[in-house]
From Swiss-Prot:
<comment type="similarity">
    <text>Belongs to the nematode receptor-like protein sra family.</text>
</comment>
<feature type="topological domain" description="Cytoplasmic">
    <location>
        <begin position="298"/>
        <end position="332"/>
    </location>
</feature>
<feature type="transmembrane region" description="Helical; Name=5">
    <location>
        <begin position="192"/>
        <end position="212"/>
    </location>
</feature>
<dbReference type="InterPro" id="IPR000344">
    <property type="entry name" value="7TM_GPCR_serpentine_rcpt_Sra"/>
</dbReference>
<feature type="topological domain" description="Extracellular">
    <location>
        <begin position="261"/>
        <end position="276"/>
    </location>
</feature>
<feature type="topological domain" description="Cytoplasmic">
    <location>
        <begin position="133"/>
        <end position="146"/>
    </location>
</feature>
<feature type="transmembrane region" description="Helical; Name=3">
    <location>
        <begin position="110"/>
        <end position="132"/>
    </location>
</feature>
<dbReference type="GO" id="GO:0004984">
    <property type="term" value="F:olfactory receptor activity"/>
</dbReference>
<dbReference type="GO" id="GO:0016020">
    <property type="term" value="C:membrane"/>
</dbReference>
<feature type="topological domain" description="Cytoplasmic">
    <location>
        <begin position="213"/>
        <end position="239"/>
    </location>
</feature>
<feature type="topological domain" description="Extracellular">
    <location>
        <begin position="86"/>
        <end position="109"/>
    </location>
</feature>
<feature type="transmembrane region" description="Helical; Name=2">
    <location>
        <begin position="65"/>
        <end position="85"/>
    </location>
</feature>
<feature type="transmembrane region" description="Helical; Name=7">
    <location>
        <begin position="277"/>
        <end position="297"/>
    </location>
</feature>
<keyword id="KW-1133">Transmembrane helix</keyword>
<feature type="topological domain" description="Cytoplasmic">
    <location>
        <begin position="48"/>
        <end position="64"/>
    </location>
</feature>
<keyword id="KW-0472">Membrane</keyword>
<feature type="transmembrane region" description="Helical; Name=6">
    <location>
        <begin position="240"/>
        <end position="260"/>
    </location>
</feature>
Amino acid sequence: MTSSNISICATEDQMVLQTSLLLRVNVILMTTVAIFTFVLTYRALFILKQRPIFHKSTKILLYTSLIFVNIHEIIFMVIQCVAFIRSFTLSDKPCEIMRTTLECRFKNHVLIFGIAGMNFNQFGLTVDRLLATVIPQTYSHLGSFPGILISILVIGCSIAAPLIIAIGDPYDDIVPNCFFFPQHSAPRANVFLIILSALVIASIFLNLIIIFANKKLEKGTRYYVSQRYQKREALISTRIIVYIAASQFLGMVLYSTIVLTLRLHKSMIPVSMYHNIVWWAYTVPFAAVALPALLIHRINLVGSNRKRVINRITAKVETQEEHMKSLKELWG
């Protein structure tokens, strides 16, 4: 089938969807989430620079994660805002309101690049934490090298993801929005969604093992200050990564599970209902905003705990001094 003999006009159901209040509310909500992501990212970058909680390698990977998050939010906001404008300006033009997958190709590729990068880099953070646990001495001397190498691999895999999904796709069908996968790429898109879910689940599982291992190792190095500091740093970093992985898990598993289920039963679902559910099931922006938000929260929490410990020690010293002063006065 070629693009010349395919109808580009929207059906009655598709027109209802494209001009519905639900779509417009969804766009406003997701755009608000994107703006929050940008603001929180700025704050997270500032805190990452100021607070020396993470190893250089981990910090580079966190910077990479924030870049992917914002690439995704920028392209998704552009896609959504275009859909919002078209829902008003083309509300009476059914043969113009739909998008061809060919004209959506670049935006769709960038969107998949962002989604893949967010998830692949999350797994990269887990590998980084694994290295810090298994070979702590070597890892500490490698500096930023592991983070740079993993980031390069993540970027390469993320570039490859949309290209592999689109292999052989003629781009001859129409979609209501550029974040929908082309029809001919659907089987590979389904595999992609399954891989993302599997990676997130693996990340959480491995991070929990790493936390347990670091707790055990920390007890075993109680009297070795340098080694205990390394284990404590690894434990704190890994806990933060687990919280981030959990947010990614909720966002990606919800999205991939719902969308995969819809794809497998697409023939049984009315068109307008199918696309409405897909729009609202796209929970990736919430996973995106959770990254800088959780980074800020967890780093501030670590800082507050440290201050509390220091204040407790200081208070204890002052109490001892007052006690000695009292004894001197008593015996003086």
